[in-house]
Amino acid sequence: MKHPFQILTSSTDGKLLIASASSPSKESSLLLLLPELGDVLCQQNVPQPIYINYLETGPDKVLITADVDKNITIYKLENNELHQLKQQQMPKRLSGISTLNNDAIVCDSLGDVYQITIDTQPAVKKEDLKPLLGHTSPLTAVVAAQYKNPPKSFLITSDRDEHIRVSNYPKSYVIKGFLYGHTQFVSQIHLFEICKESRLVSGGGEGKLFFWDWFREVLITEFDLMPYVEEYLHEFHIKKSSKTKEEQDVQKEQEVENIQPKYEIGVQKIDSIEGEDGVFIVTLVENTSCLVVVHFTDEAKHAQTIQLAAPAVTFAIVGNKLFVSLDAENDNILTIYKFVDGQFVNDDEAQSSIAERIILANPINVEDKSKFAPFYSINQLRKRGNNYS
């Protein structure tokens, strides 16, 4: 059976769907697909055993991957083939990738951010790499932001300790400011534009979305995801206690029967699509069989909850299509929706043709679902008392 895609994303120009699947045996594949047809434009089977866990696209048909062996690999698409430009060994395992100008910007689990030039120059020794900036907590994401008036570049970083930091670029040791509001880890940050203004939406361990005017360091509004995902929660989401086993046993004896369990949720992915009257934010809460769509103008309102046939692993918006990778058996691992009049609706024609082609093109096969790679790690960022989970 086919292994689900762990990574789906759009090319920078919005013309290609990029999909990656990696099995626990470290087989990996990259597919560059035409989203309107499902045809494979280019396929890259990674020659050495490697597990790709992050992927980012850049300008000029550049593709950047990070793997669990601490490598950054930079490819360029030329004549419908991926050519490796560079592979750089990093000091620590990576936790996010962005691009700015002709540089890859990467963050790691130690809390540092590095700049890797997108060129064919030889890689340097990892010991010689110098961080652009650092947090005192493991980083979870980095995005490069451009402010138009006055024109200036910034790096926005998030970490396990509730921080979102805005730093100048390239002098990233100069901190512009922080975005305060989170009380749990921040797992996702996403830039979007509305009315020609750059905005940021973030999500993490509170189960909320936070909307920011990041340049002015102002929290615009919050949106609570829990009411829209609660019916899709299960044992995975039940809040874990930081108490000792003895304390838990005493608590169980004192509890009244039929008390509803308390849940804790984490945001796994955020993306956006423009509508006629605002921006629609699509959010995946980890290990749920739904996607929550929020309509944002100057406030955030629930627009839609998309019910899925199985838990979503990831998703991508390419043009007006929404591609969702599912943690499912029987090769039903991809479903497609189209965006029409502010709603995502089933794209039956695409499902019967495009989705089937993409699934068949996936070269990673496993014996059964028990051989799937682990998909759900966001909740491991959560603190338990004075410790992390």
From Swiss-Prot:
Q: In which pathway does it act?
A: tRNA modification; N(7)-methylguanine-tRNA biosynthesis
A GO BP annotation? tRNA (guanine-N7)-methylation
Gene3D superfamilies linked to this entry: YVTN repeat-like/Quinoprotein amine dehydrogenase
- GO cellular component terms listed in the entry, alphabetical order: cytosol; nucleus; tRNA methyltransferase complex
Q: Where are the WD repeats?
A: 44-86, 134-179, 184-222
Its subcellular locations are: Nucleus
SMART domains referenced in this protein's UniProt entry, alphabetically: WD40
Presence of keyword Repeat: yes
Q: What is its main location?
A: nucleus
Q: Does the keyword Nucleotide-binding apply?
A: no
Keyword terms, alphabetized? Nucleus, Repeat, tRNA processing, WD repeat
Q: What is the protein's known function?
A: Required for the formation of N(7)-methylguanine at position 46 (m7G46) in tRNA. In the complex, it is required to stabilize and induce conformational changes of the catalytic subunit.
The entry assigns this protein to a family as follows: Belongs to the WD repeat TRM82 family.
> Matching PANTHER family, A to Z?
TRNA (GUANINE-N(7)-)-METHYLTRANSFERASE NON-CATALYTIC SUBUNIT WDR4, WD40 REPEAT PROTEIN 4
Q: How does it assemble?
A: Forms a heterodimer with the catalytic subunit TRM8.
Q: What name appears for this protein in its UniProt entry?
A: tRNA (guanine-N(7)-)-methyltransferase non-catalytic subunit TRM82
Q: What organism is this sequence from?
A: Lodderomyces elongisporus (strain ATCC 11503 / CBS 2605 / JCM 1781 / NBRC 1676 / NRRL YB-4239) (Yeast)
